[in-house]
């Protein structure tokens, strides 16, 4: 077990902003977090994180995964001060961090989100891992076995898709063609990703994805996404985080307030 205080970090806000599609929610502020071939249980009480790992694993794996090198208090403050209409977003999403995840997994997720929306994309990501990834079990200190799955590599995914007898679905067809291109045609995910992938994986924080935020930006800022992308925030990190502040707000509107103030 490793315990650390992390200000401006909130597990529930990160989960609800759809940044990390395959976290397993046990209850509010308690998650199984999967990364590559590792998984840990993390609980949060206020700013305290109780992590089911040793100190070495925290600094070698999870410190980078959670983007803890970045001062998110400064990121939040810069967004909040830029425009009064950002204040509600900044207050409600102040614990959101960008998460450093697997390249292939994020490429698939970004494409699914672009075509199907975040809710459906998260559901399908779980199904892909369950059907084609390596199955693992761990109690995580709960007393009960919890099953989780590694995200499959392109090699593993293509091998299992080729062994299936049914004709498949459009999603399976996309996955098969993508794996073949990566393995046999020198296909570069870095050069062919959409704006969401560029933000999630490449950390091209000058990008501002339009997935599911067009209507909200038009309504609240009286402009289209292309104009909104030109906002001159102090740092690129702020621009990337702002997208997830907006997405978090849309997906989880407070009961007492249905629009920005």
Protein language model features and the residues they cover:
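HhH-family (HhH-GPD) DNA N-glycosylase catalytic core used in base-excision repair
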Residues: 1-261
């Amino acid at each position: 077990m490793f315990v650390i205080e992390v200000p401006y970090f909130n597990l529930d806000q990160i989960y609800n902003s759809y940044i990390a599609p395959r976290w397993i929610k046990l209850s509010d502020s308690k998650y199984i977090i999967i990364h590559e071939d590792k998984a840990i249980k993390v609980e949060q009480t206020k700013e305290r994180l109780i992590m089911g790992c040793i100190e070495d694993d925290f600094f070698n794996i999870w410190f980078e995964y959670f983007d803890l090198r970045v001062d998110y208090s400064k990121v939040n403050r810069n967004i909040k001060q830029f425009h009064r209409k950002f204040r509600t977003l900044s207050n409600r999403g102040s614990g959101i961090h960008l998460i450093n995840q697997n390249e292939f997994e994020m490429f698939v997720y970004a494409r699914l989100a672009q075509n199907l929306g975040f809710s459906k994309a998260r559901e399908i990501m779980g199904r892909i891992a369950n059907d084609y990834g390596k199955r693992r079990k761990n109690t995580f200190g709960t007393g009960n076995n919890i099953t989780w799955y590694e995200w499959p590599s392109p090699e593993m995914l293509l091998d299992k898709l080729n062994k299936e007898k049914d004709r498949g679905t459009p999603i399976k067809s996309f996955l098969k063609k993508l794996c073949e291109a990566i393995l046999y045609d020198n296909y570069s995910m870095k050069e062919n990703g959409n704006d969401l992938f560029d933000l999630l994986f490449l950390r091209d924080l000058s990008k501002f994805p339009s997935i599911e935020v067009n209507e909200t930006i038009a309504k609240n800022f009286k402009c289209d996404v292309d104009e909104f992308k030109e906002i001159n925030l102090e740092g690129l990190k702020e621009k990337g985080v702002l997208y997830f502040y907006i997405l978090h707000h849309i997906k989880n509107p407070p009961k007492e307030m249905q629009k920005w103030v």
